[in-house]
A protein has these predicted regions:
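Glycine-rich phosphate/pyrophosphate-binding loop and the adjoining helix
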Residues: 57, 61-113
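Helix-loop-strand module that forms the ligand-binding subsite of alpha/beta enzymes
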Residues: 1-65
Length: 113
């Protein structure tokens, strides 16, 4: 599962929090709870307009915390700072593509196992 979130005042936006709330029946803090099949992997991606990575790290930590309650292993994260316009993302294309390749390669290794 890949979760991507922009920074809204140093946190995930309300829509993302609503998504997390909707997943409560599958969280290990809710008894009895449904469960996802074991072995799921997650990837946390955060972006913000400001230059500091600390805010992205907070968002990625929130996503990783969510994964933990779903018993999903966080297998990677990517923080993108100073992203206000499309051009800023285009300038990071190689980094984003490398991250996506890493996800795909990890998936292929899992399929082979």
């Amino acid at each position: 599962m890949a979760c991507v979130s922009p920074s809204y005042w140093a946190d995930v936006p309300g829509q993302f929090k609503a998504f997390i709330d909707r997943c409560t029946p599958w969280c290990n803090t809710h008894e009895p709870h449904a469960a996802l099949s074991p072995g799921k992997k997650g990837y946390a991606i955060a972006l913000r307009t400001g230059p500091g990575m600390k805010e992205c790290e907070r968002i990625m930590d929130s996503i990783e915390h969510f994964f933990g309650h779903l018993e999903i292993q966080c297998s990677g994260h990517l923080g993108l700072c100073s992203v206000e316009y499309r051009e800023a993302v285009e300038a990071r294309q190689e980094e984003i593509e490398a991250f996506c390749r890493m996800i795909m390669e990890e998936g292929e290794r899992t399929d082979e196992a």
